[in-house]
Amino acid sequence: MGDMVVEPATLKPTSEPTPSPSGNNGGSLLSVITEGVGELSVIDPEVAQKACQEVLEKVKLLHGGVAISSKGTPLELVNGDGVDNEIRCLDDPPAQIREEEDEMGAGVASGTAKGARRRRQNNSAKQSWLLRLFESKLFDISMAISYLYNSKEPGVQAYIGNRLFYFRNEDVDFYLPQLLNMYIHMDEDVGDAIKPYIVHRCRQSINFSLQCALLLGAYSSDMHISTQRHSRGTKLRKLILSDELKPAHRKRELPTLSPAPDTGLSPSKRTHQRSKSDATASISLSSNLKRTASNPKVENEDEELSSSTESIDNSFSSPVRLAPEREFIKSLMAIGKRLATLPTKEQKTQRLISELSLLNHKLPARVWLPTAGFDHHVVRVPHTQAVVLNSKDKAPYLIYVEVLECENFDTTSVPARIPENRIRSTRSVENLPECGITHEQRAGSFSTVPNYDNDDEAWSVDDIGELQVELPEVHTNSCDNISQFSVDSITSQESKEPVFIAAGDIRRRLSEQLAHTPTAFKRDPEDPSAVALKEPWQEKVRRIREGSPYGHLPNWRLLSVIVKCGDDLRQELLAFQVLKQLQSIWEQERVPLWIKPYKILVISADSGMIEPVVNAVSIHQVKKQSQLSLLDYFLQEHGSYTTEAFLSAQRNFVQSCAGYCLVCYLLQVKDRHNGNILLDAEGHIIHIDFGFILSSSPRNLGFETSAFKLTTEFVDVMGGLNGDMFNYYKMLMLQGLIAARKHMDKVVQIVEIMQQGSQLPCFHGSSTIRNLKERFHMSMTEEQLQLLVEQMVDGSMRSITTKLYDGFQYLTNGIM
């Protein structure tokens, strides 16, 4: 199937009816829904036409109007600028309608007829205003999702499905979980309206395809496999994972093919099943190329080889373009599962380094990190920098990933592999090979069809046991090294206008910076992540870049990701969406609250990836490492009370604390111990781990009954109960709540749509949505809201249950 450029329908009201090109037989043009779209099959014109006819016929029958002709006469909504301002057939003159109305009204009192006409005109006016709304600049993606979810009229749903093409990709991507959940769990009319857009975007973006496939699988997991709705979601997922949605332009951009040596077609048997990279540029034209299923298993070397190439036209990529990326992700998940079986943090850390060292043997490859916001190829994982995070029962881990940014992931060649021990005598990019990776390098890349059901075949335990863990590399900085990284770090000092700064101010700021350099944490075998997380991000990037064989490349970037196995991140994704929406609302209303939503990738119902918050450590780690109170730690890190650094950090703390207090109140966030609250280098607090929100709580203990967590230590950092910053905190709380309730519908619909068909614990109980709406207090005046904020702050600060829960976490998990 080719990649079509879809021109979606426009819904423009007209002052006068437009005759149908097909005469009285109806034809295929339905200007309300499918203008300019019928030939491209975005929405089936006959389906949309029939839907609108049924809707309008129902309206006329209910209000004493004329039944629509059974011949399928096209209909058009008039925008209300005309005299009649009513819904009518395109080919029927208004006089005919009046004559038929007179006939139908025979024997009926004139008052009743006038009432029917008035109701019909009112309904026409409503239809006209709906059209005006859909075409106005006020109609944003949030309103489109709302109408798609709440409307019961197929014609409206079909139009909204077409309207999705007009919004920016990033705006629609934000609501992708809602769109796919509606596709899975709602009726066919909604699904039929959504599917054309999803298919079109999947042709355009491989990352969008991956996210759709993962979300469809995760949100279908709560349904019985035999149900029709589940099979419908499964069919779309299989379509995405197949090769049918691959962009057609790949066939036009094939590299030159040349026969490969025989050794390239007969790889030796090895434990790690490796096939040719999806970037293979040399394929034997005489080879027997077999087509494989969307997710086949490796049975032998011949099948593995044949699966690595589907046809000459498709040789630019793997037969299933998502297969290498899926193997990359599943390899990371398998590492987490194996780490969870080890008893100590030290053993987990050693095993993690060994596993990632093996993973590097398959890189570079046509794989990417889905949490990143730009196109790139993964080239290396600095395995010695990975750390295991704190968890009692599981083994989440943090890795850093070196990538090379590219313009287009699909068409850019996979970078050539550079050996770890290569002496980089030059930094010139021109000296690097421009072609794809060689045969030896391809042998170490990701198989396109791994056997996911047998970890021993995909990753050899024997190999891991024999692997010698590499020690951190020692590098000597050459002059060109220094010059390269100096250029990267220098910021432009040019300014259009001169800026005069007093010499005393410069001396004071320099002395403050030298006197209060951020402290480093000590290595703790029981908490190896503390040191890694405390290191400033820019320093980490510089250090890893200097030790990387790819670090000299100008498009080199460093990313990080947390891999979690055994945790359902669907609630985390829901919380991310709510936080992102609240952040947008507060920015729009100019309320200086600060929150930090971090990206979530749901891989399955029990695994996923999380974007780490850089330059931040947990309050638990702060207290354990420093043995100081929170206020004393602020003074140690940022200077005395009167320094500019401390005042800035204090303001950041207040603005972020107020923002997260409102988030915790609205979403009823639980499990708020100090291990789940981070403190960054600028003084902000960041709440993490939203596994218990709305109707769920840890082990249903019910410890945390306060509106949010506000401890005495937090108030001390703000300057005490009588301080100006504490009053500023309460003022921000009030302003933030007032702003949030102005846009309540935008927040509530995110949660309400995801409740459809969900078995998540946060939706247990029938009153989840009602209680969420009540927490916006729409009926209260601003004076009443101010009193409410005062009561919540006072109650949270004095809450005995918060102290009990902190004590419980200290006794059971050692969290300070």
Swiss-Prot record:
Residues 278-297, 306-318 have a biased composition (Polar residues). The modification N-acetylglycine is found at residue 2. The modification Phosphothreonine is found at residues 263, 438, 517, 519. Residues 687-711 are annotated as: Activation loop. Residues 1-30, 101-120, 250-318 are annotated as: Disordered. Inhibited by wortmannin. Increased kinase activity upon interaction with NCS1/FREQ. The modification Phosphoserine is found at residues 258, 266, 275, 277, 284, 294, 428, 511. Residues 535-801 form the PI3K/PI4K catalytic domain. Residues 52-242 form the PIK helical domain. Residues 2-68 are annotated as: Interaction with ACBD3. PROSITE patterns: PI3_4_KINASE_1, PI3_4_KINASE_2, PI3_4_KINASE_3, PIK_HELICAL. The keyword Ion transport does not apply. It catalyses: a 1,2-diacyl-sn-glycero-3-phospho-(1D-myo-inositol) + ATP = a 1,2-diacyl-sn-glycero-3-phospho-(1D-myo-inositol 4-phosphate) + ADP + H(+). Keywords: Acetylation, ATP-binding, Endoplasmic reticulum, Golgi apparatus, Kinase, Lipid metabolism, Membrane, Mitochondrion, Mitochondrion outer membrane, Nucleotide-binding, Phosphoprotein, Transferase. Disulfide bonds: none annotated. Residues 668-676 are annotated as: Catalytic loop. Its EC number is 2.7.1.67. Residues 541-547 are annotated as: G-loop. Its main location: membrane. It comes from the Eukaryota. Pfam families: PI3_PI4_kinase, PI4KB-PIK1_PIK. Phosphorylates phosphatidylinositol (PI) in the first committed step in the production of the second messenger inositol-1,4,5,-trisphosphate (PIP). May regulate Golgi disintegration/reorganization during mitosis, possibly via its phosphorylation. Involved in Golgi-to-plasma membrane trafficking. May play an important role in the inner ear development. Interacts with ARF1 and ARF3 in the Golgi complex, but not with ARF4, ARF5 or ARF6. Interacts with NCS1/FREQ in a calcium-independent manner. Interacts with CALN1/CABP8 and CALN2/CABP7; in a calcium-dependent manner; this interaction competes with NCS1/FREQ binding. Interacts with ACBD3. Interacts with ARMH3, YWHAB, YWHAE, YWHAG, YWHAH, YWHAQ, YWHAZ and SFN. Interacts with GGA2 (via VHS domain); the interaction is important for PI4KB location at the Golgi apparatus membrane. Interacts with ATG9A. Belongs to the PI3/PI4-kinase family. Type III PI4K subfamily. This is Phosphatidylinositol 4-kinase beta. It comes from Mus musculus.
